[in-house]
């Protein structure tokens, strides 16, 4: 199963927790973990490889600097935040599907059913906030997002991606232009 994580060095501790929870809660799976990272040292990659030994392989990916030359960045909108949106550009062409997991989540169930979700021609599948979490996030989103509707909002921390479709449809410049044009409402990635 193909897993994508994106990070900089600040997210190494939570990534270790997330990967540990993924491996513990899905004991029957083997994972190909593609990691797009900024500023990681060789010993960082070695520690991640050791953590996943026997159950998964870490594939460190380099980021072409020129791809992000026009990317607007801010405190919460770092270069690393864009990596998931441009996954199809950064991952090997041999991959057609990947499950993106934020480094700061906990995996509490097997992820195979999620990974195998029928996307019905859509580029991605994502979850909305529900239950107790919606009671926390909805008021914040009403303040920061014009015309906020809970049903139209999704959590970008867990995404099933159709990479083949994304390669046909997603253009980096369009993403950067949108981020630049909507910086006032795009507070959190």
Describe the function of each predicted region.
Residues 3-9:
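A conserved hydrophobic helix/loop-capping motif in glycosyltransferases and polysaccharide synthases
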Residues 31-39, 126-127:
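Short internal beta-strands
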Residues 43-90:
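Active-site-proximal specificity loops/subdomain of glycosyltransferases
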Residues 98:
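Short aromatic/hydrophobic "clamp" motif used to bind/position activated sugar donors
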Residues 101:
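Catalytic metal- and UDP-sugar-binding loop of GT-A-like glycosyltransferases, i.e.
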Residues 129-132, 151-189:
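Catalytic core and acceptor-binding pocket of nucleotide-sugar-dependent glycosyltransferases
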């Amino acid at each position: 199963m193909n897993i994508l994580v994106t990070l900089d060095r600040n997210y190494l501790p939570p990534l270790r927790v997330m990967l540990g929870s993924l491996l513990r809660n899905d004991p029957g799976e083997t994972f190909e973990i593609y990691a797009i990272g900024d500023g990681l040292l060789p010993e960082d990659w070695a520690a991640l490889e050791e953590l996943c030994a026997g159950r998964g392989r870490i594939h460190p990916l380099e980021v072409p600097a020129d791809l992000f030359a026009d990317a607007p960045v801010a405190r919460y909108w770092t270069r690393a935040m864009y990596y998931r949106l441009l996954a199809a550009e950064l991952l090997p062409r041999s991959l057609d599907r990947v499950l993106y997991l934020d480094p700061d989540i906990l995996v509490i169930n097997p992820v195979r059913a999620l990974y195998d979700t029928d996307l019905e021609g859509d580029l991605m599948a994502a979850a909305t906030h529900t239950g107790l979490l919606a009671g926390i996030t909805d008021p914040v989103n009403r303040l920061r997002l014009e015309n906020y509707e809970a049903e139209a909002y999704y959590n970008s921390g867990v995404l099933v991606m159709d990479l083949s479709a994304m390669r046909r449809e997603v253009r980096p410049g369009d993403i950067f232009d949108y981020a630049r044009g909507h910086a006032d409402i795009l507070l959190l990635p």
